[in-house]
Swiss-Prot record:
It comes from Methylorubrum extorquens (strain PA1) (Methylobacterium extorquens). GO terms for cellular component: cytosolic large ribosomal subunit. Part of the ribosomal stalk of the 50S ribosomal subunit. Interacts with L10 and the large rRNA to form the base of the stalk. L10 forms an elongated spine to which L12 dimers bind in a sequential fashion forming a multimeric L10(L12)X complex. One of its GO terms (biological process) is translation. Forms part of the ribosomal stalk which helps the ribosome interact with GTP-bound translation factors. Keywords: Methylation, Ribonucleoprotein, Ribosomal protein, RNA-binding, rRNA-binding. Belongs to the universal ribosomal protein uL11 family. The keyword rRNA-binding applies. One or more lysine residues are methylated. The gene is rplK. PANTHER family: 60S RIBOSOMAL PROTEIN L12, LARGE RIBOSOMAL SUBUNIT PROTEIN UL11M. One of its GO terms (molecular function) is large ribosomal subunit rRNA binding. It comes from the Bacteria. This is Large ribosomal subunit protein uL11.
Length: 149
């Protein structure tokens, strides 16, 4: 018989840097899950990734206090900032204050958008790479990036 699911926890955790402090500890603790077990398993799975890359994770909590987790691709904004060369670190660079109106914060090519779309395809809610490129193009514009051919 399958285990009974008691809930889901969605978090965005830096690769290789899961620890019991907030937001992980309180989110898992209130469901009665073993926080250190998750941290060790997550850090082991993300050991080969670039340290600090934000990884969206969905944790499924079961009635017997066990859990499973599924990792997604990093957010589109992370890939866009990386492609353009905006600072990614302790204090991430923000996009334009007035997207589409004021000065742009960088330029991105259609080829770079397609590359990002192919990476993100499993996580996006679209059927074709062209539709994924259109979604990512919209995110780029909203961040204040200029899309060039």
């Amino acid at each position: 018989m399958a285990k009974k699911i008691t809930g889901y926890v969605k978090l965005q955790v830096p690769a290789g840097a899961a620890n019991p402090s907030p937001p992980i500890g309180p989110a898992l603790g209130q469901r009665g899950l073993n926080i250190m077990e998750f941290c060790k398993a997550f850090n082991a799975k993300t050991a080969q990734m670039e340290k600090g890359t934000p990884i969206p994770v969905i944790i499924t909590a079961y009635q017997d206090r066990s859990f499973t987790f599924e990792m997604k691709q990093p957010p589109v904004t992370f890939f866009l900032k990386k492609a353009v060369g905006l600072k990614i670190g302790k204090k991430p660079a923000s996009g334009s204050k007035t997207p589409g109106k004021g000065p742009t914060v960088g330029k991105i090519t259609e080829a770079q958008l397609r590359e990002i779309a192919e990476k993100k395809m499993p996580d996006l809610n679209c059927d074709s790479v062209d539709a994924a490129v259109a979604m990512i193009r919209g995110s780029a514009r909203a961040m204040g990036l200029e899309v060039v051919a």
